[in-house]
């Protein structure tokens, strides 16, 4: 009922929200929103003027090379003595401009020196990256490849021991026929020889000592002992076969006698 009466009566006015025409007739609503913006501006300007008083008017002047102001000196440092002299004589401040322009010109010279030094740096890095080949890393017995290489390894040169080296090696062999690695290194350093040369000399010297004393070779001795053991085993097997023959025959005859009974 309330909704239908409200729709039928088109002239019904809600008392809470009066029409805008009454506000416009009574000048409650301004024609443009300038009213609010002006109120804000005026209030802000008034507050700004109270906090910050207006500055005094100053006359703008044009600057040129002769009227460049001097840079502010940092705290704790006074004005240079030359500036006092120039100010006392009445010379313009533009005379100091070359000094200001000269100071920035120094870094390019340093930069050029750095640029000249940089090309040498890659060479040093390249040389440092090259692997260092020590003498012990090289193969002494392998010769360089040449055009006349026929595929066979060249003959190794025979080491010629001096009289003093042979004497020291004979002394060591008299006390120790077999060397440890530590002792071999010590002898090699003492006689200025390689470990391989010391090892080969002792091997040859042991073979000579066995030949002089007529000692049998261990390899031949082991092979002969193996053949003797095999022959002995064959003889034992044959003897056991011959011994077991009559017993088997007597057993067979005894079985036949039992069956006959």
From Swiss-Prot:
Motif Antp-type hexapeptide, residue numbers: 133-138
Residue intervals passing through the bilayer: none
SUPFAM superfamilies attached to this UniProt entry: Homeodomain-like
GO terms, molecular function: DNA-binding transcription factor activity, RNA polymerase II-specific; RNA polymerase II cis-regulatory region sequence-specific DNA binding
Gene3D superfamilies per the UniProt record, alphabetical: Homeodomain-like
Annotated region (Disordered), positions in chain: 85-130, 212-261
Regions of compositional bias (Polar residues) in chain numbering: 114-130
GO BP, sorted A to Z: anterior/posterior pattern specification; embryonic skeletal system morphogenesis; positive regulation of transcription by RNA polymerase II
Bias kind Low complexity: ranges: 101-113, 222-245
Assigned keywords, A-Z: Developmental protein, DNA-binding, Homeobox, Nucleus, Transcription, Transcription regulation
Localization per Swiss-Prot or TrEMBL: Nucleus
Domain of life according to the entry: Eukaryota
GO CC annotations, alphabetized: nucleoplasm
DNA-binding stretch(es), residue numbering of this chain: 154-213
Function per UniProt: Sequence-specific transcription factor which is part of a developmental regulatory system that provides cells with specific positional identities on the anterior-posterior axis.
Annotated family: Belongs to the Antp homeobox family. Deformed subfamily.
Protein name: Homeobox protein Hox-C4
Organism annotation: Oryzias latipes
Gene: hoxc4
């Amino acid at each position: 009922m309330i909704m239908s009466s409200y729709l039928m009566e088109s002239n019904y006015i809600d008392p809470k929200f009066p029409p805008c025409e009454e506000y416009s007739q009574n000048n409650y609503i301004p024609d443009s929103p300038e009213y609010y913006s002006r109120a804000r501006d005026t209030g802000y300007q008034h507050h700004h003027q109270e906090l910050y008083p207006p500055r005094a008017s100053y006359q703008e002047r044009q600057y040129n090379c002769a009227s460049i102001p001097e840079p502010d000196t940092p705290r704790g440092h006074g004005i240079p003595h030359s500036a006092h002299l120039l100010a006392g004589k009445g010379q313009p401040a533009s005379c100091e401009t070359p000094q200001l322009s000269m100071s920035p010109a120094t870094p390019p010279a340093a930069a050029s020196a750095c640029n000249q030094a940089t090309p040498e740096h890659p060479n040093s890095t390249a040389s440092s990256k090259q692997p260092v080949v020590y003498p012990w890393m090289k193969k002494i017995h392998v010769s360089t490849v040449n055009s006349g290489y026929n595929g066979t390894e060249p003959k190794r040169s025979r080491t010629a021991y001096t009289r003093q080296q042979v004497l020291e090696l004979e002394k060591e062999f008299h006390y120790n026929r077999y060397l440890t690695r530590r002792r071999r290194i010590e002898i090699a350093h003492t006689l200025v020889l390689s470990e391989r040369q010391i090892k080969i000399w002792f091997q040859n010297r042991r073979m000579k000592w066995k030949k002089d004393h007529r000692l049998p070779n261990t390899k031949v001795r082991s092979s002969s002992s193996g053949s003797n053991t095999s022959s002995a085993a064959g003889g034992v097997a044959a003897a056991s076969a011959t011994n077991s023959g009559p017993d088997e025959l007597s057993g067979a005859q005894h079985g036949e006698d039992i069956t006959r009974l």
